[in-house]
From Swiss-Prot:
SMART domains: GIYc. Gene3D superfamilies: 5' to 3' exonuclease, C-terminal subdomain, GIY-YIG endonuclease, UVR domain, UvrC, RNAse H endonuclease domain. The gene is uvrC. It is found in: Cytoplasm. It comes from the Bacteria. InterPro entries: GIY-YIG_endonuc, GIY-YIG_endonuc_sf, GIY-YIG_UvrC_Cho, RuvA_2-like, UVR_dom, UVR_dom_sf, UvrABC_protein_C, UvrC. This is UvrABC system protein C. The lineage of its organism: Bacteria, Bacillati, Bacillota, Bacilli, Lactobacillales. GO terms for cellular component: cytoplasm; excinuclease repair complex. Residues 14-91 form the GIY-YIG domain. Residues 196-231 form the UVR domain.
Length: 594
């Protein structure tokens, strides 16, 4: 068991779901389901196993998991993932049988059937169910509640089920289509979970039978109510309409965004895509950018439908994706988006938890890093990153790692003061000069290594300030990212060259951790500054509202949206005169009306 698996095992949730074991090449070699992901996945790496399982475990290099809402959902998702990926260690289902559905026929006098064959425009289908037994039990319950036609006898003859109170076909006029439409609508609502009315009716009948001392009949109604409660579990990972669709969910935290895409094909959730990256603008804006890039990749075929979270403007998505864009508002479809969002949150949290837990891996990394660079052991490392959007609200940030661990009390933020426009090199020169002129003249502790986020230009700018302007002797290295915003390579030396670092080494992990942390700190600060500037600029030109009062408003209301909802009294409570508060409200009202 490698270190990655050890740490990921500690972060597994106590939730139902599916897990996917992978080999060194990243190929899925086994798919399983679990009522409790934590307990099930851990069991592979504890205790003894039979020969077959030992062989499987010996090939596991990594694993992923998908959280579901119930064990039934996990079972159904497992079926789809196995059929889609055909992992070599999974037992193939005999004859590759499909799974049972309950069908309401399109006949003039509809019947309830169990079928494994789905044909378009041939009736209504509900399911799939994990096995024939489950489907049969649900149908039995429906037969006892809804008096559909049960056999192929002519409707003018009484059948056996009539005597059981389970068929009324012969008593209904041939032309009374409204009755059957109403019955079908009731079953649809029932199977979609809207069963409160039926339960209320059954409960009333149970109480009436009990009152009349018809205890056997009362027990039948009680059993029906119990049966309904048993089958209330929704199967959200399946879709009954056989539609191809992609389902997007996203979650943001600490300057990072995780997007999960569920691929539903022929009504089955067969695969997912997970991507995590730092975001720079508003979350909704960067999500839209991601969606555009996602479908520009020819590997991602555009389905008929795309489901998106309700916070996203569907008209903007429709402008870049030629598909039907849906923001589900209720029911199963909304729950699917919620499930994708939940998995995005879990994945992002796992990333952060892994980073924290893996700090233990850095114990020997500092010394090895010093040896690789040919410098003394870099006990104290200071790292810098710039953040701006086309030169607006430019800022920079510095994080400090001591003995391989973040020293947050030493973190620093910088607002760029002398640079106009988007000039990363000039911004880096300014920040490095401001920081290390203080180190030089105020006797502050100097680092053993400076790391800048960027390539040769940033490194040369920083080194020029350190060596020529300040006359200091502090090594400077650069960390470059790849096109996926992942730590890619370390630059060092004179002339600058790439330092070869194994991707699985402790030194590489330490640098990756530092780069992630300084980037997170920088963009979080940038977002705060940009939000504050936007808030203040919208309040310009209001007489009597200077910087201090704007600061009070920002501290109290946090956003323009909240301020626009504030009352005159709430604004005055901050010590703002009534005339100024009234002018502010008038200004906000006129802005919202335009």
């Amino acid at each position: 068991m490698n270190e990655l698996i050890k740490h990921k095992l500690e972060l597994l949730p106590d939730s139902p779901g599916c897990y996917l074991h992978k080999d060194k090449a990243g190929t899925i070699i086994y798919v399983g389901k679990a009522k409790n992901l934590r307990n099930r996945v851990r069991s592979y790496f504890r205790g003894s196993h039979d020969t077959k399982t030992e062989l499987l475990v010996s090939e596991i290099a990594d694993f992923e998991f998908i959280v579901t809402g119930s064990n039934t959902e996990a079972l159904l998702l497992e079926i789809n993932l196995i059929q889609e990926n055909m992992p070599k260690y999974n037992i193939k289902l005999k004859d590759d049988k499909s799974y049972p559905f309950i069908k309401i026929t399109n006949e003039p006098f509809p019947r309830l059937l169990i079928t494994r064959q789905i044909k378009k425009n041939d009736g209504l289908y509900f399911g799939p169910y994990p096995d024939a037994y489950t489907a049969t039990e649900v149908k039995k319950l429906l037969d006892r509640i809804f008096p559909f036609k049960k056999c192929k006898n002519p409707v003018n003859k009484v059948c056996f089920y009539y005597h059981l109170g389970q068929c009324q076909a012969h008593t209904i006029c041939h032309t009374d289509k409204a009755y059957w439409d109403s019955l079908v609508a009731d079953v649809k609502q029932f199977l979609n979970g809207k069963d409160d009315k039926i339960i209320d009716d059954l409960r009333s009948k149970m109480l009436e039978a009990s009152h009349n001392q018809e205890f056997e009949r009362a027990a039948e109604y009680r059993d029906l109510i119990s049966g309904i409660a048993t089958m209330r579990t929704k199967q959200r990972v399946m879709s009954k309409d056989l539609q191809d669709r992609d389902i997007f969910g996203y979650f943001v935290d600490k300057g990072w965004m995780c997007v999960q895409v569920f691929f539903v094909r022929q009504g089955k959730l067969i695969q997912r895509d997970v991507n995590m990256f730092p975001y720079y603008n508003e979350a909704e804006e960067d999500f839209l950018t991601y969606v555009g890039q996602f479908y520009s990749d020819q590997r991602h075929l555009i389905p008929k439908e795309v489901f998106i979270p309700e916070t996203i403007d569907e008209t903007l998505v429709a402008a870049i994706v030629p598909a039907r864009i849906v923001k589900p508002q209720r029911g199963e479809k909304k729950q699917l988006v919620a499930l994708a969002t939940k998995n995005a949150r879990v994945s992002l949290q796992q990333k952060f938890d892994l980073l924290e837990k893996d700090l233990r891996k850095t114990s020997g990394a500092i010394e090895h890093l010093g040896q690789l660079l040919g410098i003394e052991k870099p006990v104290r490392i200071e790292a810098f990153d710039n953040s701006n959007i086309q030169g607006t609200s430019p800022v920079a940030a510095m994080v400090v790692f001591v003995d391989g661990k973040p020293s947050k009390k030493d973190y620093r933020k910088f607002k760029i003061k002398t640079v106009i426009g988007p000039d990363d090199y000039a911004s880096m020169r300014e920040v490095i000069y401001r920081r290390y002129s203080r180190v030089k003249h105020e006797g502050l502790q100097a680092p053993d290594l400076i790391i800048v986020d960027g390539g040769q230009g940033q490194v040369k700018a920083a080194r020029d300030v350190i060596e020529h302007q300040l006359g200091l002797s502090i090594p400077v290295a650069g960390l470059q990212k790849n096109d996926k915003h992942q730590t890619h390579e370390l630059l060092f030396g004179n002339p600058l060259a790439v330092v070869e670092l194994p991707r699985n080494s402790e030194e590489f992990f330490l640098l990756h951790r530092i780069q992630d942390e300084v980037h997170r700190f920088a963009i979080t600060f940038h977002r705060q500054v940009r939000s504050k500037n936007a808030f203040s600029s919208k309040l310009d030109h209001i007489a009597g509202l200077g910087p201090k009062r704007k600061q009070l408003l920002l501290k109290r209301f946090k956003s323009m949206a909240a301020l626009e909802q504030a009352s005159l009294e709430e604004i005055q409570q901050l010590g703002i005169p009534k005339t100024v508060a009234e002018a502010l409200i008038d200004h906000l009202t006129s802005k919202s009306d335009t």
